[in-house]
């Protein structure tokens, strides 16, 4: 049980370093860009699937 407590303490410290270090803001910007890229790819794949017709 102590091992789990130490493991979660280390994970929390690493998350705090990322959160308070300014990396979170940069990651949020990158995540927004990736979100729109994958939405566009999803829309393109839907259109391509619709244009190809029914498959047998």
Curated annotation (Swiss-Prot):
Q: What is the annotated localization of this protein? A: Cell membrane
Q: Which residues cross the membrane?
A: 4-24, 29-48
At the top level of its lineage, which domain of life is listed? Bacteria
Question: Looking at the keywords, is Cytoplasm present?
Answer: no
Q: Which UniProt keywords apply?
A: Cell membrane, Membrane, Transmembrane, Transmembrane helix
Cellular-component GO terms for this entry: plasma membrane
- Which Pfam families does this UniProt record tie to the protein? DUF1328
Q: Which InterPro entries match?
A: DUF1328 (IPR009760)
Bilayer disposition of the protein = Multi-pass membrane protein
Would you identify the family this protein belongs to, as annotated?
Belongs to the UPF0391 family.
The protein's name in its UniProt record: UPF0391 membrane protein Jann_3570
Which lineage? Bacteria, Pseudomonadati, Pseudomonadota, Alphaproteobacteria, Rhodobacterales
């Amino acid at each position: 049980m102590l091992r789990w407590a130490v493991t979660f303490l280390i994970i929390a410290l690493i998350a705090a370093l990322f959160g308070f270090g300014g990396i979170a803001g940069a990651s949020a910007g990158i995540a927004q860009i990736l979100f729109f890229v994958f939405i566009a790819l999803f829309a393109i794949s839907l259109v391509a699937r619709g244009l190809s017709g029914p498959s047998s």
